[in-house]
From Swiss-Prot:
Biotech and industrial use: When conjugated with a fluorophore, could be used as a tracer in surgery to discriminate nerves from their surrounding tissues, particularly during tumor resections or after traumatic injuries. The dye is conjugated to Lys-4 residue and this synthetic peptide shows only a small decrease in ability to inhibit Nav1.7/SCN9A compared to native peptide.
Protein name (record): Mu-theraphotoxin-Hsp1a
Entry text on domains: The presence of a 'disulfide through disulfide knot' structurally defines this protein as a knottin.
A GO term, aspect molecular function: sodium channel regulator activity
TM stretches of this protein: none
Family from the record: Belongs to the neurotoxin 30 (phrixotoxin) family.
Chief place where the protein resides: secreted
CC annotations in GO: extracellular region
InterPro entries: Huwentoxin-1
Pfam families: Toxin_12
SUPFAM superfamilies in the cross-refs: omega toxin-like
Disulfide bonds: C2-C16, C9-C21, C15-C25
Source organism: Homoeomma sp.
Record carries keyword RNA-binding: no
Length: 28
């Protein structure tokens, strides 16, 4: 299952192919 949201907080799931995602929160 890939990320469908362009802005996500889940760095463990890769984004869907063709979409550019950015982490809107930094855990580390």
């Amino acid at each position: 299952y890939c990320q469908k949201f362009l802005w996500t907080c889940d760095s463990e799931r890769p984004c869907c192919e063709g979409l550019v995602c950015r982490l809107w929160c930094k855990i580390n």
